[in-house]
Every structure is written in C-alpha cells, then in structure tokens.
C-alpha cells in the first residue's frame, strides 16, 4: 500500500484552488490593439481548459472586461457557468463608472479579494 507523504497535496486540489487576478483590459505591454486580441484569446482559452481556477478577480481597468460592451463577456460568463467565481473590484467599478453596467459575477471589496488570495493554493497575476 502506497501512502501519501505528510503535507503532500493532490494536484487536483491544488489546481482547484488557483485564483487568477486580472488587472488590465488588455494583455501585455505595447500595441493596444494586440493587447485586446491577446486578452480575448486568454479568456477564451481559460474557459476551454481544465482544471478551471477557483476564482477570477478583476481589478483596476480589468473590470472593463466584466461590464457592458466587453468583447470577452461570453468567455467570462462561460467560466461563471462552469462554477468559477467572478469578482470585480467595487472601487474600480466606481472609478470607471461601470458599477451599474456589470454583466457577470459579483462586486467585491478589498477584504473579499484579499481573503480569496490568502486562501488560494496559487495566485496568478495577469496584467
């Protein structure tokens, strides 16, 4: 009989507790148009692959991706429909005057964002 080493965690459990933080409405530095294409590709691929993250949180201009008019709403809604928590920073939504235009997920505050990050097995920052 094989025993799991003390402190070992299964890959599935670790991956299931991954939190992704998206802090911009485009991916990378340089050409803005390319950055928008890349964030669209990233959110599409994220929604299509497994294992899915536990949560995706949107901060700063990243909240534009969860609001009316976003080109990636379909991808983010697919994540939410698959059980991924979608959280947008309330202060950020207020700053960009988007709180009433939120189309997916919930409004979070810095306390809920920090709580999610602290309880995550891994945090991936995009932005």
Pin down the residues of each PLM region.
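A glycine-rich helix N-cap at a beta->alpha junction
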Residues: 72-98
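Short acidic-hydrophobic, aromatic-tinged amphipathic segments that line or gate anion-handling sites
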Residues: 104-112
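Conserved mixed alpha/beta catalytic, RNA-binding, or beta-rich assembly cores of soluble enzyme
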Residues: 3-69
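Short, well-ordered beta-strand core segments
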Residues: 56, 85-86, 123-124
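Short amphipathic alpha-helical segments and helix-helix/interface helices
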Residues: 43, 73-77, 114
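C-terminal binding/interaction regions
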Residues: 110, 117-125
């Amino acid at each position: 009989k094989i025993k799991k080493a003390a402190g070992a965690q299964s890959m599935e459990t670790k991956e299931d507790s991954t939190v992704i933080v998206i802090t911009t409405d485009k991916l990378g530095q340089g050409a803005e148009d390319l950055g928008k294409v890349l964030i669209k590709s990233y959110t599409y691929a994220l929604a299509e692959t497994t294992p899915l993250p536990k949560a995706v949180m949107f901060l700063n201009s990243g909240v534009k991706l969860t609001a009316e008019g976003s080109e990636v709403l379909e991808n983010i809604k697919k994540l939410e429909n698959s059980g991924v928590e979608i959280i947008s920073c309330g202060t950020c939504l207020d700053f960009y005057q988007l709180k009433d235009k939120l189309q997916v997920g919930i409004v979070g505050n810095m306390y809920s964002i920090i709580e999610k990050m602290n309880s995550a097995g891994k945090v991936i920052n995009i932005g």
